[in-house]
Amino acid sequence: MNKTGNEKSTFTLAYFSTLLDGYNLTVSAPLIVILSRFMNLSLLDTALLASSALIGNAVGGFLMGRLPDRFSRKTLLIVDLLLYAVMGLFSSLSITIAQIIIFRMLLGIGIGGDYPNSSSLLAEIQGNTGRGKSVGFLGTSWTIGFGLSLLVGLLLYPLGPDAWRILLFLPVISSVVIIILRSHLNESTPWKKSREVAKRDNVRRIFSKELRVFTIYVTTFWFFFDAIHYGISEYAPLVMKTIGLHGNTTGIIASLILASVEVIGTLVGISLVDREGRRKVQIIGFLGISVSMLVAAFVTQEYVLIFVLFALGEFVGFGPGILEFIYPPEMFPTELRGTGAGFANSMSGVGAVIGVLIQPFILGLSNGVTYLFLMYAGMAFAVLMLTIAIAPETSSKAVITEMPEIQ
């Protein structure tokens, strides 16, 4: 399918906004490391700093995911970015830890709306051929944003006590540019055709008998995947210290390498996801995560463990790292697409928050690292079994534009 200039711009801006999503959702890891140099952060401070944007993401996915179905894909794409540009600015100007937490929580609400809206819009524009690759590249963009947050944090670490302000302010500039460019985009044609239908109670409809299995699957896999992924990415410095690797920036460096491996994994995944199918890629991804976490639980040599974690990154990117963007918009019709993807993103945010909040307490236990990796292995294995049992294959199907009346 040959894209028009407007469609190419839509894809490009979606990729860049998702890159900013990845940056903003994972910047807490270097933020905590930098703040710890100059402040005595409590365990509660650390947990709330790590989870604040994720909490907002969970709320935003539910509240703002529904709005594009009712009002406008284009308008909400601008509102989402405007919200987290403003809150990103306020975060960088904060004078207390509490203010950083509150503003980043509000920033997360904007991210929660951008996630489902961007993937829904791209799925509606892209034809059946190559849809997985085009939409899946959002996963690559997100992971690049993850890596950039770590790289910027690493570069800013040697600077003075205000380095964290620069870390939080940099995405604001890019957000403003994307907002201006998005204002010139066209509205989604499938959405314009379905807008009257979308005025119904969409949350209830995604649990109708026609869509219930899709909703259960996509929310469950995304919930557990984000619990694992954010639990590891947000606390990599703490994990590295616990397994015996010290140094103020060791965790950031390890996470940066992990993010680089994930990028490679996403590129491999999107090269196969249309040809081999969604189910096969997802199964391989969660199988790899399960095995990696199980091996990590019983490895005692620090550097072997790091190698295992890098293998984990490859499988994370290969499977769920791209399918969290591909699957949701393919499972719901146009009038429910933002609602369904938004609800799934909201539940993934809940999983991410749980993963982030419980990890410091587990690591504080004797043999805490072993328990942590065993827990993650169990989560991944449960999703693997669920995928084998009920995950649909959507690669050869056109995106659903409408469906029969749902009671």
Predicted regions and their residues:
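Extracytoplasmic gate region of multi-pass secondary transporters
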Residues: S28-A29, E210-T266
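Conserved MFS/SLC helix-loop-helix module at the cytosolic interface between two early adjacent transmembrane helices
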Residues: V59-I97
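Paired small-residue
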Residues: L83, M87, A98-L106, L305-L312
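Extracytoplasmic
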Residues: S9-L43, H229-P237
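Helix-breaking motifs and short loop linkers at transmembrane-helix boundaries and internal kinks
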Residues: N40, S72, L93-Q99, G127, ...
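Symmetry-related core transmembrane helices of the 12-TM Major Facilitator Superfamily/SLC fold
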Residues: R165-I180, L372-A389
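Cytoplasmic helix-loop-helix junction between adjacent transmembrane helices
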Residues: F103-T140
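Glycine-rich segments within core transmembrane alpha-helices of 12-TM secondary carriers
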Residues: G130-G153, S174, N345-G355
